[in-house]
Curated annotation (Swiss-Prot):
Belongs to the STT3 family. Changing residue 531 to R/E/D: Significantly reduces catalytic activity. Residues 27-67, 113-121, 169, 241-252, 297-303, 345-347, 430-591 are extracellular. Gene3D superfamilies: 3.40.50.12610. Despite low primary sequence conservation between eukaryotic catalytic subunits and bacterial and archaeal single subunit OSTs (ssOST), structural comparison revealed several common motifs at spatially equivalent positions, like the DXD motif 1 on the external loop 1 and the DXD motif 2 on the external loop 2 involved in binding of the metal ion cofactor and the carboxamide group of the acceptor asparagine, the conserved Glu residue of the TIXE/SVSE motif on the external loop 5 involved in catalysis, as well as the WWDYG and the DK/MI motifs in the globular domain that define the binding pocket for the +2 Ser/Thr of the acceptor sequon. Mn(2+) binds at residues 36, 146, 148. It is an enzyme of class 2 (transferase). This is Dolichyl-phosphooligosaccharide-protein glycotransferase 1. The lineage of its organism: Archaea, Methanobacteriati, Methanobacteriota, Archaeoglobi, Archaeoglobales. PANTHER family: DOLICHYL-DIPHOSPHOOLIGOSACCHARIDE--PROTEIN GLYCOSYLTRANSFERASE SUBUNIT, DOLICHYL-DIPHOSPHOOLIGOSACCHARIDE--PROTEIN GLYCOSYLTRANSFERASE SUBUNIT STT3B.
Length: 591
């Protein structure tokens, strides 16, 4: 069968699984997947309609506001169609861009696999496994207008170019530069590629890789910590190329060099050097040394079962087994390092799935060979045939044996193994009908604010838990106390866990709160699906030492309970103004 047809089938599969929730997204408007997407669109709306990208926003962390520090590339990409054709075009483009990037990433996996093994069947299997991996789907699903899809695409493009010969290695620095302009954490993925390159390449190739890292170091002009990090990685690789020259005399020279480099980083971490505080910040980020990170689902550590499920279930197990047979040190190094990252924070499974797909595809290929479905053997024979410039009759006869039914059986085998992946990859839309109605009501019924001017402090704010902050900001066009950036989260947590109305109203006055929004999932209404323990943790309570019964008893004495469960009937300064199923809106009165 024509490999182009099979690749097209993989692409169509990747599109299909990523087009979930189409009806929810285009439901009487345009909605997005997740939470962070909404703040990106808030920035894009200001950029398109007001012709500037704000570096400060009074509509979050009200009334203090918050500085916008992350790189702007992704926002400018989303805003570009709007600058030409109006904001509505950016709204639509933002819905489909992650899917486009996801499909391109699938193609890059295929090309990378070809670069590593030079076998089309192996490459197609790699692409299919990556296309089905739950975490790869979640990051590139329809409406997921967040920077992750772009970062992963650029990471894959960098890896692919590094694996090519000659000057292509230097060009790998270009996608790394774009990655640096899209995510402040880009040096983490740059380091992952650098360590993998050091282990895999010889000294000559390593010098080209080192040169490529000077390109993203240019980002120093806009983001000095990022630029310095990439320059440090370039130096690390250049010195590594020198060390490689001594491997004939000192067998483990590279290993000692890596150990020495890690020790140097640790020294920088523990010694208070003002100019290198970003190193400490980066390490703390990786290890999740932050009060907020343990309360974020994707930032949890040591989630081994979730790592397995997010990376492909049985396919991830295949990857672990394949480590015993696979010989490409670039892929093996990337797998082990990204696995360590994923153990530190679950979010890094987005990069772990890359080597995992390649490794599992290799084991699947070996199994197919044992079942007399030619994969590597067929490629070898075809190569010999091309060299002889004539078709060997035996090869031709063997190729003819691989008919449609054989391909169909193999495809069915791969799909059956991928069923758990597909089931997990399809997730309910975050924004329920109750929330859509509540957000639209707030947009049209509450006092209007000058939403498009983030530099002007509005008259009031809306208190909610941080998960809903960006929804309220973008859809309802109202200022919020806290959103997914965690600023304001402590006050929000203390407000909801307050044991007296007086305590809650003091926080409300401090934060200029006029309305409060609650939902079932932040209460203890369903103990198996609740955000309340996370709220308690942010408020300063040690939830780990409490039983479920103690947490429930604590909840029953909070202002959140008296608001959401009792509809504020026994409160003086709050009254229920509107209810939309699971979502309730209260007004602060007499404050």
């Amino acid at each position: 069968m024509d490999r182009k047809v099979l690749m097209l089938a993989v692409i169509l599969f990747a599109l299909a699984v990523r087009f979930q929730n189409f009806g929810e997204i285009f439901d009487s408007g345009i909605y997005y997947t997740g939470y962070d997407s909404y703040y990106h669109m808030r920035l894009v709306e200001v950029m398109v309609k007001e012709s500037f990208r704000p570096d400060y926003d009074y509509y979050i962390n009200y009334p203090f506001g918050l500085k916008i520090t992350w790189p702007p590339l992704f926002d400018y990409i989303l805003a570009f169609p709007g600058m030409l054709f109006g904001f509505h075009s950016s709204e639509i483009f933002a819905v489909f861009l992650p899917v486009i990037l996801g499909v391109l990433s699938v193609v890059l996996i295929c090309l990378t696999a070809l670069q590593i093994v030079n076998n089309q069947t192996f490459a197609l299997i790699s692409a299919f496994i990556y296309a089905a991996a739950p975490v790869a789907v979640w990051k590139t699903v329809l409406g997921q207008a967040d920077h992750h899809a772009l970062v992963i695409f650029l990471f894959l493009l960098s890896a692919y170019l590094l694996l090519k010969d000659g000057v292509w290695k230097i060009l790998a620095g270009l996608p790394m530069l774009f990655m640096a302009l899209a995510w402040l954490g880009s040096p983490i993925y740059g380091a992952l590629l650098a360590f993998s390159a050091l282990v895999h390449f010889d000294r000559k190739a390593l010098r080209l890789v080192a040169a490529s890292y000077l390109i993203p170091a240019i980002s120093f002009v806009l983001y000095p910590p990022v630029g310095i990090s990439f320059f440090g990685l370039a130096a690390f690789l250049f010195v590594g190329s020198v060390v490689k020259g001594y491997e004939d005399r000192f067998r483990n020279a590279t290993i000692y060099y890596i150990a020495l480099s890690l020790a140097t980083v640790l020294i920088i971490y523990f010694i208070p050097l003002p100019h290198f505080e970003f190193v400490k910040g980066g390490i703390n980020y990786i290890f999740g040394a932050n009060i907020y990170l343990p309360t974020i689902s994707e930032a949890r550590s040591l989630q081994i079962f979730e790592i397995i499920s997010a990376s492909g279930y049985i396919y991830f197990i295949f990857a672990l087994i394949s480590v015993l047979f696979f010989r490409n040190r670039f892929v093996l190094s990337m797998f082990f390092l990204s696995f360590i990252l994923a153990l530190m924070q679950l979010r890094f499974t987005e990069v772990l799935v890359v080597p995992s797909a390649l490794l599992s595809a290799y084991l699947v290929s070996l199994v197919l060979e044992r079942l007399e479905y030619p994969v590597f053997e067929k490629a070898d024979e075809e190569e010999k045939s091309r060299r002889r410039k004539r078709k060997d009759r035996k090869v031709k006869q063997k190729n003819a044996e691989v008919e449609w039914k054989d391909h169909a059986v193999v495809a069915a085998f791969l799909v059956i193994l991928a069923i758990p992946c597909i089931v997990v990859a399809v997730v309910p839309f975050d924004l329920t009908e109750d929330w859509k109605e509540a957000l639209e009501w707030m947009r049209t019924s509450l006092e209007e604010q000058n939403y498009l001017n983030p530099y002007e402090k509005p008259e009031y704010s809306v208190m909610s838990w941080w998960d809903y902050g960006n929804w309220i900001l973008y859809v309802s066009k109202k200022a919020v106390v806290c959103n997914n950036f965690q600023a304001g989260a402590v006050d929000a947590a203390k407000f909801f866990t307050a044991k007296s109305e007086d305590e809650a109203i003091k926080i409300a006055k401090k934060r200029g709160v006029r309305y409060v929004v609650t939902a079932d999932e932040i209460t203890m209404k369903d103990a198996n699906n609740t955000k309340f323990p996370a709220i308690m943790r942010i408020a300063g309570y040690n939830v780990d030492l409490m039983t479920e019964g103690e947490i429930l008893n604590f909840f029953n004495h909070t202002v959140l309970y008296r608001l959401h469960m009792e509809n504020a009937e026994n409160l003086t300064h709050f009254r229920l103004v509107k209810e939309f199923g699971d979502v309730k809106i209260f007004e602060v009165v007499g404050s």
